[in-house]
């Protein structure tokens, strides 16, 4: 097994498209984008508290006078990677539901990663931001983000977890062995880095909710 670590989602999507990867661990949106360019299929996602879903949060600097999403009007908002589900697509849709649109009602800034979003808000470079709830909770528990400086003002509905994917043209027997291997993992030492109880099965249809978000925000996903 050869491990390839890419610098961002776009480079991983390209690696999958050119057949340099057999398996890949995508975010929900980056999977949808990769699926448009290559024949891949999701087969497993981490299971936490019995679920293969997770949430995003919208956070705010405690001194910015923001108590609810509507208060973000006129502010600077930090997002992560443009191809990120929970640090871009989901929080942006939460703002859009309150009639707040980037470039019209607030200024958006892409800072690259979830932790960078939280740090930008904590440091006051942005008054609000969006990221994964599990990642935010980890940053707080590690002491990197101070609750007295950053607060959660909204949580999203549940969305499908980051999928493990494989090339669709792999040998069918190999594909089944890979799926079975993931589903049978129960060693705490292996699961600890994933902060997971185990893995659950997922399918392409589970990610239609992400595609629908793209439509809601009038995003041309082919240009990502």
Predicted regions span which residues?
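Short helix-initiation/N-cap motifs at beta->coil->alpha
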Residues: 3-14, 102-119, 158
